[in-house]
């Protein structure tokens, strides 16, 4: 491809709304353009990378015998109502009506639709197991789309679904996907971890995430030297419950003006923040729930949703709380509240003489105690497990790293097949619900994750496996000899099957070099004054520089050797 014919509009300045490196660099380097919040056009460079990611994913799916299909984006509401997720999925689901007033959704995922498909196609155990997958656009109305393609409202996803007649078969397919997804990470060239995860709104009884490490990631991976790893939404807290050794004091209501957080309350009252019990109100299918956690810990919403078996659970709005409880959100507490289920973290059980909201603006209760002053309906593990907490396997302190979730696999069991009446006939002639697995991979998110992990101050550093071009040939001027050799080299490398960009633009060499670094092409061949000495300069995007004899064969051979040694994670400073 000649740069003069290629649409790659690079920018000198970062977009004002860029929050993370991938959003800035993919925009500046001409890979994407923002159309609306969370909605992007992929320009030719971006599309080339996406196609390579898709190719790797497709090859790994082919290797495990999965079958590619393509399902519609628009899905009828009836299917989601059958599974119970029309309401459970929450406000992230994009809903619409057709001209006849019928409800539809722009599919955020396709469990319901694929289950409906197979119930009309598969009717015997002899047709099982089978795995179907697609790569298609998905839609989720994120409350705050952010981080460019990492958290978008429209995104490209590979979603796969397997159907089985027994759990052993599901186990085999689950393991095959786990290996295939690890292969995808390794073939792309990302540093990653496979972690235990929460199943969330998808459901199921076993789940793993494939997380690419990145400082800007929204996933918090906890791992231990024993080999255990889990998403902090999933990792149980197994620390010791500390029982306060003190006499019970009389409860009092005290004036606490202008305090908003647990730390504010602790500072105002002169007590440790762990002596504060935070009260959080959630609203679900069955009304309100009150959750209590120590002031020095955070509530884990996924744990609460799983404990209550209600994925529709959402944090109550300040307006709802003021309307239904008559108190501002910062002064809620369990004392004197009736008609609401109270669930406390296990750590609250050991606390004595703690502080809670006074159910009146600018007031808190001090010296509060469970059982004497209010009742807890149920105890549960509700807190976010964090770095330094004990490993649930060996008890040693956990370490933490940030990451970006790219893949997620689930053992769904019979959740969807039972809800939708999807059954097959077993060998005894009995109708049984399909046992299912689900396997997702964020294709467009992978584009952003690579850049988050592999970039420097000059731009992107693409791994060879997904780079839009492997080589850029850069003549430093339009001098006849330089251009003639550059054209010959370009044609020779193209004939050899190389993906080459010839920068034939009539601009300064500095601008060409800057664009090559910004775009992130692994190898740059500079055709300049060294040609008069029979040499060209080759620079790797990772910084290494070489002089190579200016013959077509020697340049080609050097590039082949460079491909074997090039590692985008090993950069040199110049």
UniProtKB/Swiss-Prot annotation:
Belongs to the class-II aminoacyl-tRNA synthetase family. ProS type 1 subfamily. GO terms for biological process: prolyl-tRNA aminoacylation. This is Proline--tRNA ligase. It catalyses: tRNA(Pro) + L-proline + ATP = L-prolyl-tRNA(Pro) + AMP + diphosphate. One of its GO terms (cellular component) is cytosol. It comes from Fervidobacterium nodosum (strain ATCC 35602 / DSM 5306 / Rt17-B1). Disulfide bonds: none annotated. PROSITE patterns: AA_TRNA_LIGASE_II (PS50862). Keywords: Aminoacyl-tRNA synthetase, ATP-binding, Cytoplasm, Ligase, Nucleotide-binding, Protein biosynthesis. GO terms for molecular function: aminoacyl-tRNA deacylase activity; ATP binding; proline-tRNA ligase activity. It comes from the Bacteria. It is found in: Cytoplasm. InterPro entries: aa-tRNA-synt_IIb (IPR002314), aa-tRNA-synth_II (IPR006195), aa-tRNA-synth_II/BPL/LPL (IPR045864), Anticodon-bd (IPR004154), Anticodon-bd_dom_sf (IPR036621), Pro-tRNA-ligase_IIa (IPR002316), Pro-tRNA-synth_IIa_bac-type (IPR004500), Pro-tRNA-Synthase_IIa_type1 (IPR023717). The keyword Aminoacyl-tRNA synthetase applies.
């Amino acid at each position: 491809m000649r740069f003069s014919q290629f649409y790659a509009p690079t920018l000198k300045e970062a977009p004002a709304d860029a929050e993370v490196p991938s959003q800035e660099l993919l925009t500046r380097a001409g890979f994407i353009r923002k159309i609306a919040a969370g909605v992007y056009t992929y320009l030719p460079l971006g599309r080339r990378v996406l196609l390579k990611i898709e190719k790797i994913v497709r090859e790994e799916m082919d290797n495990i015998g999965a079958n590619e299909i393509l399902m519609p984006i628009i899905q009828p509401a009836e299917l989601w109502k059958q599974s119970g997720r029309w309401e459970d999925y929450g406000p992230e689901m994009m809903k619409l009506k057709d001209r006849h007033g019928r409800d539809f959704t722009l599919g955020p995922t396709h469990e319901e639709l694929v289950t409906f498909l197979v119930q009309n196609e598969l009717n015997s155990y002899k047709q099982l197991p089978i795995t179907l997958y697609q790569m298609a656009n998905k839609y989720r109305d994120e409350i705050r789309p952010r981080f460019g393609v990492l958290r978008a409202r429209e995104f490209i996803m590979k979603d796969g679904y397997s159907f089985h007649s027994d759990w052993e078969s599901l186990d085999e397919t689950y393991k095959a996907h786990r290996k295939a997804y690890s292969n995808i990470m390794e073939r792309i060239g990302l540093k990653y971890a496979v972690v235990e995860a929460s199943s969330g709104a998808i459901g199921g009884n076993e789940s793993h995430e494939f997380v690419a490490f990145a400082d800007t990631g929204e996933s918090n991976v906890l791992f231990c030297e024993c080999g255990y790893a889990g998403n902090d939404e999933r990792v149980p807290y197994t620390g010791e419950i500390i029982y306060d050794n003190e006499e019970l004091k009389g409860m009092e209501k005290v004036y606490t003006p202008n305090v908003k957080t647990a730390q504010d309350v602790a500072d105002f009252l002169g007590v440790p923040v762990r002596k504060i019990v935070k009260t959080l109100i959630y609203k679900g299918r069955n009304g309100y729930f009150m959750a209590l956690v120590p002031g020095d810990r955070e509530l884990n919403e996924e744990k609460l949703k799983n404990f209550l078996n209600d994925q529709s659970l959402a944090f109550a709005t300040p307006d709802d709380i003021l309307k239904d409880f008559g108190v501002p959100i910062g002064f809620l507490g369990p004392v004197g509240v009736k008609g609401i289920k109270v669930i406390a973290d296990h750590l609250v059980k050991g606390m004595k003489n703690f502080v809670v909201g006074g159910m009146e603006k600018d007031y808190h209760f001090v010296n509060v105690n469970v059982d004497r002053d209010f009742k807890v309906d149920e105890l549960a593990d509700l807190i976010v497990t964090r770095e330094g907490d004990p490993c649930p396997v060996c008890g040693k302190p956990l370490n933490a790293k940030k990451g970006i979730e790219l893949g997620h696999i689930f053992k769904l069991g019979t959740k969807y097949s039972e809800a939708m009446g999807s059954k097959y006939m077993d060998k005894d002639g009995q109708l049984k619900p399909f046992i299912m697995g689900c396997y997702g991979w964020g294709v467009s998110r992978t584009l952003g994750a690579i850049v988050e992990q592999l970039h420097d101050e000059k731009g992107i550093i693409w791994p060879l496996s997904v780079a839009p071009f492997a080589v850029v040939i850069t003549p430093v001027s339009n001098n006849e000899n330089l251009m003639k050799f550059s054209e010959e080299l370009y044609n020779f490398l193209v004939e050899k099957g190389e993906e080459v960009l010839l920068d034939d633009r009539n601009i300064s060499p500095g601008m060409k070099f800057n664009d090559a670094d910004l775009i992130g092409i692994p190898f740059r061949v500079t055709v300049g004054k060294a040609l008069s000495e029979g040499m060209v300069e080759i620079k790797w995007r990772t910084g290494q520089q070489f002089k190579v004899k200016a013959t077509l064969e020697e340049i080609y051979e050097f590039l082949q050797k460079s491909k074997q040694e090039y590692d985008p994670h090993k950069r040199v400073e110049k």
